[in-house]
Amino acid sequence: MIAMNTPDFQRMKKDNKKISMVTCYDYWSACIISQSNVDCILVGDSLAMVMYGHSTTLPATVEIMAQHIQAVSRGAPNKFIIGDMPFCSYRKDLTTSMNAVERLMQAGAQAIKLEGADAHNLKFIHHVVKSGIPVIGHLGLTPQSIYTLGGFKVQGKEPSAAKKLMADAKALAETGCFAMVLECVPSELAELITHSISIPTIGIGAGPATSGQVLVLQDLLGTNNQFQPKYLKKFLNGFELIKKALDDFDQEVKTSTYPHLETHCY
């Protein structure tokens, strides 16, 4: 039984209880998360970068997303799972875009997430919500628009940009999103948006006043020692711990310490 549902997001904001979300891409990681207190899981299109080594999220496809959603849903059947709509999958004709939504939902997602709030997206979100499918919005740094934005940069620093973000947030809430991600926006702006809309905000690089926080599992575990954006706290030095385990294995194999005849052999 899934421990969380869409009304819980609204209730938690109303009760001033923070929402914890972790981005996860695979079965074994999901198994661990399933035993944790983390509220929900995002299967993000960032898997194109984290799992496949691309420099952007753009190479993620609907089929790749569906495969990873299936793996995560098998590992964490008790968690609320959000699936990212990948690059251009919701910018096509309505039938094709809805086929993409259907694929992700049938793969095991309980909701979808998409980036931006232009007229096309708002119309599509309205249709998806009216179809009975929960939607999370995403504003601020929207990685699928990385070439338009000019890189991975903080958004909403200028007054005009901040005003637009506020308007977009209100539009997403009014269109029917049940929550939204705010990525890499100034803390004060994120706080204003959070207090100005009825739905919860999930921050990443958006300060402490959002309704919750999301981090990529590999980032919070510190498995990439080359990645240290300002917003990231590494809750474990995973890189060094994993490297040490590998070096210890290598050493024991080469010294014939492992496998031990009495302990590890049949």
From Swiss-Prot:
Name of the protein described by the UniProt record: 3-methyl-2-oxobutanoate hydroxymethyltransferase
Tagged with keyword RNA-binding: no
Family: Belongs to the PanB family.
The gene coding this protein: panB
Active site positions, chain numbering: 183
Cofactor requirements of the protein: Mg(2+)
Record text on subunit structure and interactions: Homodecamer; pentamer of dimers.
InterPro entries linked: Pantoate_hydroxy_MeTrfase, Pyrv/PenolPyrv_kinase-like_dom, Pyrv_kinase-like_dom_sf
Transmembrane region(s): none
Pfam families: Pantoate_transf
SUPFAM superfamilies listed in its UniProt record: Phosphoenolpyruvate/pyruvate domain
CDD domains found in the cross-reference section: KPHMT-like
GO biological process terms held by the UniProt record: pantothenate biosynthetic process
Location within or outside the cell: Cytoplasm
